Every structure is written in C-alpha cells, then in structure tokens.
C-alpha cells in the first residue's frame, strides 16, 4: 500500500493531513490505495498534462488517471495550486478548504465516481461535503 504526495511548488501545504484525508476517502469508499501518487503543482504543468492527455489547452483544478480496475487502486492525480488559489478567492472559501475539496474530489475520481452530468455532479458534491465535514477529526 503506497500513497505518495509530491509538491512541485514553493507553496507550503499540509501534506500529512492531505495524505490522511486522501487515504480515508479511498478506504471509506471500499478501496485500497495500492499505488496512488498525488502531485500538487502549478498551472503550467497541469495545463501541459491537460493538453497532452485530454486535448484541452487550459489549466484546470485536477486531472485524475486510474490505471486499473478492482478494489486496489493504482492511479495518480494532479492538482493545480494556482487554480485552487484563484477558486478559493473567487468562491470565498479559503485556500485550505478548497485544497481539501479538490483532493477529496480527486480521490473520489480514483474510486470510480464521475462528475459528467448534473446528477453525477450533484452526487459527487454530496460526497465531497460529507468528507469535508469529517476534516476536523482526521
């Protein structure tokens, strides 16, 4: 079981708590983080990944790749701290709250949840909110 976090930016983030939260979400959804890599980066890297792998030439908050199926998750996700910062100011949520929301969102993608379509998006948001409410105890 391996969960690795990498911060490619100069910004300080709560890596230990992020690791606990990501692991908690994956396990609470009935999965095991066999090999999971979380990369916290800037706009330039996530835009390049978005362009090369998804054909979208813009920065986004997160991109998730799942490499297998079954209960043991092998995958990775990228989170743009630049987009997190912009969105936290735009939605007046605070940087850390937005960071944890997107990390939870990414973990849910690894667990197989999709957010394409209104109903799926609403279901994912409900799960995100539930896990966000658990943050103080994690």
Curated annotation (Swiss-Prot):
GO MF assignments: metalloendopeptidase activity; RNA endonuclease activity; zinc ion binding
UniProt cofactor(s): Zn(2+)
Entry note: cofactor: Binds 1 zinc ion.
Top-level taxon of the source organism: Bacteria
Binding site for Zn(2+): 105, 109, 115
Keyword Transit peptide carried by entry: no
EC number of the protein: 3.1.-.-
Job description of the protein: Single strand-specific metallo-endoribonuclease involved in late-stage 70S ribosome quality control and in maturation of the 3' terminus of the 16S rRNA.
Gene3D superfamilies named in the record: Metalloproteases ('zincins'), catalytic domain
Name of the protein: Endoribonuclease YbeY
Matching InterPro entries: MetalPrtase_cat_dom_sf_prd, YbeY, YbeY_CS
UniProt KW Nuclease keyword: yes
Organism: Chlorobium phaeobacteroides (strain BS1)
Similarity comment: family membership: Belongs to the endoribonuclease YbeY family.
Keywords: Cytoplasm, Endonuclease, Hydrolase, Metal-binding, Nuclease, Ribosome biogenesis, rRNA processing, Zinc
GO biological process, one term: rRNA processing
Main location class: cytoplasm
Phylogenetic placement of the source organism: Bacteria, Pseudomonadati, Chlorobiota, Chlorobiia, Chlorobiales
Cellular component GO terms held in the UniProt record: cytoplasm
Subcellular localization: Cytoplasm
């Amino acid at each position: 079981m391996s969960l690795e976090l990498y911060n490619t930016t100069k910004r300080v983030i709560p890596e230990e708590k992020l690791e606990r939260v990501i692991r908690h979400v994956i396990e609470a959804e009935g999965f095991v983080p066999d090999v999971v890599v979380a990369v916290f980066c800037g706009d330039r890297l996530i835009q390049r990944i978005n362009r090369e792998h998804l054909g979208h030439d813009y920065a986004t908050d997160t991109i998730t790749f799942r490499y297998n199926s079954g209960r043991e998750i092998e995958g990775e996700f990228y989170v743009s701290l630049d987009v997190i910062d912009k969105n936290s100011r735009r939605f007046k949520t605070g940087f850390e709250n937005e960071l944890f929301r997107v990390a939870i969102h990414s973990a849910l993608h690894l667990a197989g949840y999709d957010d394409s379509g209104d109903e799926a998006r609403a279901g994912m948001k409900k799960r995100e909110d539930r896990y966000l409410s658990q943050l103080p105890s994690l």
